[in-house]
Amino acid sequence: MADEESSSSSLLSKDLKLPPKTARDIGSVDIKEDEDPFGEISTDARARQRLVSEGSTTAEAEEKDLKETCRVAFDKITQYLNGELTASLEDYTLLEQLNNLTTDKYKEMSTMTKSLITTMEKLDDKYKSLQPYLEQIDRIEDSVSSLEQAAYRLDAYSKKLENKFKRLERR
């Protein structure tokens, strides 16, 4: 009996040019069938017409559902890809902004460094121009310190002489 249903279902699908699933789905339609010796099914015209209209409606509905599902899937894939591309674009825009800020910062630092180099060169030139005066100050300082030493020695010697003179005077 199951073999008869599967063969009748496949024969219906061949006669109606419907996929086997559709023929099985509409197999619940009440149709009077007579088998001929070759295993083909014969039906009356009205039942066959009802089967065709229900089968085509089901096939059309399945095709419509499939198209709608595909459209929704493509829309969601499009949204996903647009989101990914937008995120990548925003990442690259952020990187570009960071690169521009870094470039500006390095330009600013380069300008500051050049300014510092110029200032240091000027200070070095001033130091070189003051060098003879600094050497003269060092020589004067040495002279002052040797004069101070001489003054201390003279003071000590004068105190000695004063003490000797006082001793001689007392005698």
Swiss-Prot record:
Composition skew (Basic and acidic residues), residue ranges: 14-24
GO biological process, one term: lysosome localization
InterPro entries, per database record: BLOC1_su2
Matches recorded under Pfam families: BLOC1_2
Record-level GO cellular component terms: BLOC-1 complex; BORC complex; centrosome; gamma-tubulin complex; lysosomal membrane
Stretches for region Disordered: 1-63
Lineage top rank: taxon: Eukaryota
Single GO term (MF): gamma-tubulin binding
Keywords linked to the UniProt accession: Coiled coil, Cytoplasm, Cytoskeleton, Lysosome, Membrane
Residue runs in coiled coils: 135-155
Location within or outside the cell: Cytoplasm, Cytoskeleton, Microtubule organizing center, Centrosome; Lysosome membrane
Family per record: Belongs to the BLOC1S2 family.
Record note on quaternary structure: Component of the biogenesis of lysosome-related organelles complex 1 (BLOC-1).
Function: Component of the BLOC-1 complex, a complex that is required for normal biogenesis of lysosome-related organelles (LRO). May also participate in the coupling of lysosomes to microtubule plus-end-directed kinesin motor. May also play a role in intracellular vesicle trafficking.
The protein's name in its UniProt record: Biogenesis of lysosome-related organelles complex 1 subunit 2
